[in-house]
Amino acid sequence: MSDYLLQMNGIVKTFDGVKALNGIDIKVRPGECVGLCGENGAGKSTLMKVLSAVYPYGTWEGEILWDGNPLKAQSISETEAAGIVIIHQELTLVPDLSVAENIFMGHELTLRGGRMNYPAMIHRAETLMRELKVPDMNVALPVSQYGGGHQQLVEIAKALNKQARLLILDEPSSALTRSEIEVLLGIIHDLKAKGVACVYISHKLDEVAAVCDTISVIRDGKHIATTAMAEMDIPKIITQMVGREMSNLYPTDAHDIGEVIFEARNITCYDVDNPKRKRVDDISFVLKRGEILGIAGLVGAGRTELVSALFGAYPGRYSGEVWLDGQPVDTRTPLKSIRAGLCMVPEDRKRQGIIPDMGVGQNITLAVLDNYSKMTRIDAEAELGSIDREISRMHLKTASPFLPITSLSGGNQQKAVLAKMLLTRPRVLILDEPTRGVDVGAKYEIYKLMGALAAEGVAIIMVSSELAEVLGVSDRVLVIGEGRLCGDFINHELTQEQVLAAALSHPGDPDSNDPANNNHNDNDRKTT
């Protein structure tokens, strides 16, 4: 019998004559966690779709050996029956069903006559959650009553209930808090000890380093290297991923900061479900021409609610004023905001940033169709010219602008959303989690773009949950806590500890602000 549970040998997958995978080899032993690393568009998701039979046997070349025997699965149900289970970045739970019902979906236990055996399902679900160290979870409650971290564990329980021997985790921590991530990594270590193998796909390389035994890197559809994690470090992984050394993830190009161009006055947002509760409480701040303002805070602090209100996209009731060039402007809808010179790249690009049924190019020009309108028709040649320029400027990887945008990787979808907003020629650009789910190479390109836009005089507001990112690219940092402004810092030798201390402080406390706060006379961007 082979030492390997899984062997993928010489995998080739072609789309319209283009090789998305070109001879990739991957091997996984029982109880081993293999980190699958690569930039967006490198082929990671395509490879996992081959393995899980989303692309069935016969639609690709090469061979898959499972326990030393050829695997020629034609459907996901066949691979799951073999013990290969994938947990996607977007959870597949049904919110209104109970935890137990979600765990047994498609594999329900029944009594004679076909009735559901709910007591048996609840007992088994409770056993699974205890194994995952969540003994107090009420598996009879709707899964929607639990947060993202617990829902991720329900997905793992669902996989274990299918007798998973190989667990594929695709960006499993993208919506989790730091503490939830620690729980997840601990559970993966426990599963490894029980002989369950894992393939871990994540752009968060610190997680990859913490949980993986082996690193396999692919680039442009080709296998670059497979190395024991003990012989690797994060800079080496990055070098293999991007094909070049990156001495500094955050660009250090200086840019001048001008006069105040934007002002938010007394922004207050009320909870959608509880209109008496304030999600954002009377926040005011200014923004200068060419300035990059980072907004930091803990999960639930109100950062997304704040910027959504500024752009006119907050779904609940809100109040306050937005001023541009010393004059109040109407930003009560996204269209009015765009016309005023304010645009936003939203946090949830799949639901709010793209139209899935449209092509890449159509998504890029969606916000500026008036620019190409001639009476009752669109000037297709002019539109395509703009699309090609944006694809080139954004280094967007696509075989054709006419392909569905859903055919792109997450990072390239994000570049398309950015291109769409930049075609509006904004004076103020809001970026909400702009690099979430984006690989390290694409992150660097986005940071470079932000610096170039700031150098052109565009004022930028960036919300990010990654403190290193906030400190790496921002000129100034606002800290939000429990819906209120807790700190306003010039980013000069500012530390993550100072930002966290402000986020955890009570707004208005003397200690919640650094002495440098509100000192906005520093017109040169810090260098890192």
From Swiss-Prot:
Is Nucleotide-binding among the key words of this record? Answer: yes
- The protein in question is named Xylose import ATP-binding protein XylG
Outline the extent of the ABC transporter domain: 6-245, 262-507
Query: EC number(s) of the enzyme?
Result: 7.5.2.10
| Residues involved in ATP binding | 38-45
Asked whether the UniProt record includes Phosphoprotein among its keywords, one would answer no
**Looking at the record, which segments are called Disordered?**
504-528
Show the InterPro entries listed in the entry: AAA+_ATPase, ABC_carbohydrate_import_ATPase, ABC_transporter-like_ATP-bd, ABC_transporter-like_CS, ABC_transptr_XylG, P-loop_NTPase
Which transformation does this protein catalyse, written as a reaction? Answer: D-xylose(out) + ATP + H2O = D-xylose(in) + ADP + phosphate + H(+)
GO cellular component terms? plasma membrane
Name the coiled-coil region(s).
Answer: none
What protein family does this chain belong to?
Answer: Belongs to the ABC transporter superfamily. Xylose importer (TC 3.A.1.2.4) family.
Superkingdom assignment: Bacteria
Gene Ontology molecular function: ABC-type D-xylose transporter activity; ATP binding; ATP hydrolysis activity
What Pfam families would the database entry show? ABC_tran (PF00005)
Membrane topology annotation: Peripheral membrane protein
What role is this protein assigned? Part of the ABC transporter complex XylFGH involved in xylose import. Responsible for energy coupling to the transport system.
Q: Where in the cell is it found?
A: Cell inner membrane
